[in-house]
């Protein structure tokens, strides 16, 4: 009977929903396992094929862990606040809440159609006031502990979207979304002091099971470095402080560079100290149109303006050195000023060459240098030269001596610095969590009483940001006007909202107890489920969401709300699913390729023509999926054509889980055929109890390998092993009931619908669902082959292959080799001078004569 995947999948999805198969409660009799995947932003486009790759992998792990006896929490929810929904709502004159509900309903139906074992009773939504009540509560705790504050700061301002943009959203001075000009604007923003947790965020990584690239990216993003702050005097009488990790090179500092936004520069301009003020102001205006990312690109041309009217004073030799402004120095890193040592820094060297500045070697290495041609940067080790009291010292000793000198002479001190900046926590938009703060002219900023939470969004119809950059909420005076919780006088609400990252910074805690009214989760639930045992997500979230949520969790731990210092014990990441590039020559239909070859004469010329038409991307056959390229795969269509189990199996089989992989429709059909072959085995049952001798070793090997591979996310090799086993069963005329039962059990986490149906077909009652049926066990001794194939070589050339006992002795193996007719012929008339047996692999006979 042909497998009817549509009927079977609908049947088991209904069973799981009706019987709440995957509903979970606290059970102290079982070990707990909390598996977490990043909850999706419910966009209007619906689920794409990239989502199920992560969800399926942890679903496979979760299903296996249930069968291993664990009490498994595997939840799902919606990260539903955000700009795309708000923009769609504005364009179509629909309230964002209505758009969000529609999108969530669509996503939910798509996920249920794929058979994920989520506990849907724990579903959460960041836009639900009962959820964001606790997001607001966490903000209030941060404020009360001095970690939330207001600050005037330079921000990227989109003149079209009328809101603050992250650096990543600015490309060539325009908004990535709308193409409008982006300018720097000073705005008062709410900030979260994540820098207070910089050390804890780095040091906490040591005890976690994070894949190496995740840990490395977080450490690099935080950017902890050990160096010194050095105070340079100026001819204007002020002090310029710089941070450097190479204070040993101070004698080689021949100029200084400050950021265009530096506070001292503003003061010097106001006092009339700067003689070339017009040129300086023009450069400041130009820099204001660039993002921090554009300004700090290493390969960009170095630009700058020397300040006419003020010089710096090198503290070690009292030499006056010029001061420049340049956009590659950022006000947000270090002190916004640097000392430049062009002999030993490529960027400083290029700048010095352009402006004709002195270049003084101060570190002599083991290899020769030519400072006329390039900076000598191999200076991690070496000996100090041209450096006064540091001459002859090693780099390590020179750093120590210079810091001592700076401190003794009041010229500086040792310092630990971080690249990490405090978190900008304001958005001038409607569709986000209201910030629970009010401003009173008498009392200043005051937090709302916790009893008044949640502070809900007003039900409005105009979501357009104001031309003055204010949030749309600012226009709704009835909502804005309130009373001060401190003095009872008139006050105004904060009209900025929280960023989308807010709700996702603690959602994993709410899953533990999603209906709790008195706290973000009950103490019992937090103590039972914490921490998350395994979290899988995208690498693109490593330095934003993952870092922010670790910060919030560590703060909640410090104030006694959660029982563990870290939120996630294990973090893995999946590779992106890529699509075929329709503009690449190799992906064109054959007739289109022939047409281009006739027109241009060669494939190389045709590819050049495609590049001229479509750009450099046409050279890449495999690219990121995008609507503009028309290569986006709709999972609904795949499920409709092949079934959910086939799609799940394919996404796990398509390659190394951690690496990007191209979507290949032809390979889906192969996975579908494999499932059909497994289904057909139920029609080919053979007589016999248990495992047959000729298949027993492979059965035990497969149980062992599939179990181990699931736990290390080597899903593709686990499936390949199952395919090998199924082929062997067909080669042996079919499967016994016990053999097929084991295949079904091992395949169940990957293809849960079909395997539940087969399990029932094999005579198991409804109370024996595979979802909780114990995982098969293997015996280590039976994983070892009783016989092995060895090669027999004569003078290095293979003459025969023999099947021998796996535990055969060296003497018996050599004797068996010599007894083989082909080997005996090769030895005829010759003298054996050396005999070697490599256990389980080969016999090598060296002969002469």
Predicted regions located by residue number:
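Non-catalytic terminal extensions that flank enzyme cores
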Residues: 1-46, 72, 201, 215-225, ...
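Conserved oxyanion/phosphate-binding beta-strand-loop segments in alpha/beta enzyme cores
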Residues: 1-36, 66-75, 99-106, 281-324, ...
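Residue patterns forming the tRNA-binding/recognition surfaces of aminoacyl-tRNA synthetases
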Residues: 2, 18-19, 91-248, 263, ...
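Long, charged, mostly alpha-helical binding arms that flank functional sites
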Residues: 3, 224-229, 237, 364, ...
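NTP-handling and nucleic-acid-processing catalytic cores
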Residues: 3, 8-13, 49, 135-364, ...
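N-terminal catalytic cores of NTP/NDP-binding nucleotidyl/phosphoryl-transfer enzymes
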Residues: 25-94, 100, 123-138, 244-245, ...
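Helix-rich, typically C-terminal accessory recognition domains appended to large enzymatic cores
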Residues: 79, 144-145, 149-156, 414-443, ...
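Flexible, glycine/threonine-enriched loop-and-boundary segments that flank and lead into catalytic domains
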Residues: 214-241, 290-319, 323-324, 423, ...
